[in-house]
Each structure stands twice: as C-alpha cells, then as structure tokens.
C-alpha cells in the first residue's frame, strides 16, 4: 500500500509549513488527485486515519479535489477524457496518446491555526 507513504509525505509537508508559519496546527488541507494517479481512495482514507494521529493534521479537515484525466493523441492532436492509461483516440482510433492531465497528486493548500 503506497498510500501510507504518500500520506506520510503529506504529514511531513504539513509539519514543515506549520513550522514556517509559526503555527500550532492545520485547520484544513486541500489535495488535488488525478483519476489516473494510481491512488486508491479507500486505501488513502484508511492510511490517513492512522497516519495523522498525534500530528498537526489530527484535527484538520481533508478536502480532495478530483481531476479528470485528459489525453492528447500524438497522431491527430485530439484531446479527450481518458478513463485508462492506454485508451484509443475516439477521433482517429490511434493508441499513441499522452496523458496530459489527471496523473497528479498535489497539496494545493493548507490553512493553519496560530493559537
């Protein structure tokens, strides 16, 4: 389950940013996760509940923005919503495509509490 290591990385980012801001805790954190990022949301949620205990994220609201995947055909340039990493272009039927959006996993923002 690589989701646990992802959550541990998010905790580290939150702790570093909280220290920089001279804050005590995080009120909310917003993540951006692409539909083709490879992250299993149920596993992320399970890992999240365990990993945030005793950290600055323990009482934080978790907001997740899902990003739909978009592919661009290398043959005809057509852009389309992708449901898998290897999907044919609906315009020319080529399988030579690039995923241009939807593989990301980012910490977009966090709000901190200075007591």
Language-model segments: which ranges?
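C-terminal binding/interaction regions
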Residues: 111
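Compositionally biased, charge-rich low-complexity tracts
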Residues: 114-115
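Long, charged N-terminal interaction/targeting segments
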Residues: 1-58
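Short cysteine-rich clusters marking metal-coordination/redox-active sites
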Residues: 73-76, 89-92
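Cys/His-enriched microdomains
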Residues: 71, 87, 105
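Short functional micro-motifs and their immediate structural scaffolds
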Residues: 81, 94-98
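Short, flexible, mixed-charge glycine/proline-rich loop motifs
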Residues: 61-68, 78-83
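Solvent-exposed beta-strand sheet faces enriched in polar/charged residues
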Residues: 29-32, 63-65, 108
């Amino acid at each position: 389950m690589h989701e646990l290591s992802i959550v541990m990385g998010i905790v580290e980012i939150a702790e570093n940013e909280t220290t920089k801001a001279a804050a005590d805790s995080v009120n909310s954190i917003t993540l951006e996760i692409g539909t083709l990022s490879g992250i299993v949301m149920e596993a992320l949620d399970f890992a999240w509940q365990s990993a945030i205990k005793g950290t600055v994220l323990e009482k934080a609201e978790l907001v997740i923005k899902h990003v739909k995947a978009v592919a661009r055909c290398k043959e005809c340039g057509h852009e389309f919503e992708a449901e898998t990493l290897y999907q044919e272009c609906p315009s020319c039927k080529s399988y030579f495509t690039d995923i241009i959006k939807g593989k990301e996993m980012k910490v977009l923002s966090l709000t901190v509490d200075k007591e």
